[in-house]
């Protein structure tokens, strides 16, 4: 992530330190009770324009919680923007868009 990067995930986080703190909080609160995680990132759609790029990538993350044994099925979309500065590519923006799956239907079917 560039120092002026932005993350849209559980709020808006600007700057590398704020982004790191967001991920650390998520890992400590949401990831810690999970075991057997399968994080699958699909083929990204990439739009390259000089020193800037945009991508969209679908993601599946499936796991079991330790205490309840409940299966967790997460589907998301990563919308990313990258910038190349001084020959190096880094994230300029990441938006994590949660998506519903067939397993979250309100009617339970």
Model-derived features: where do they sit?
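Beta-strand elements of well-folded, non-transmembrane domains
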Residues: 59-65, 82-84
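Extended, polar beta-sheet/loop recognition surfaces of beta-rich domains
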Residues: 14, 104-109
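Short, surface-exposed coil-to-beta transition loops
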Residues: 39-41, 73-78
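Short, cysteine-centered beta-strand-loop-beta hairpins and adjacent loop/turn segments enriched
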Residues: 62-72, 101
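A solvent-exposed, acidic/Ser-Thr-rich amphipathic alpha-helical stretch
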Residues: 1-60
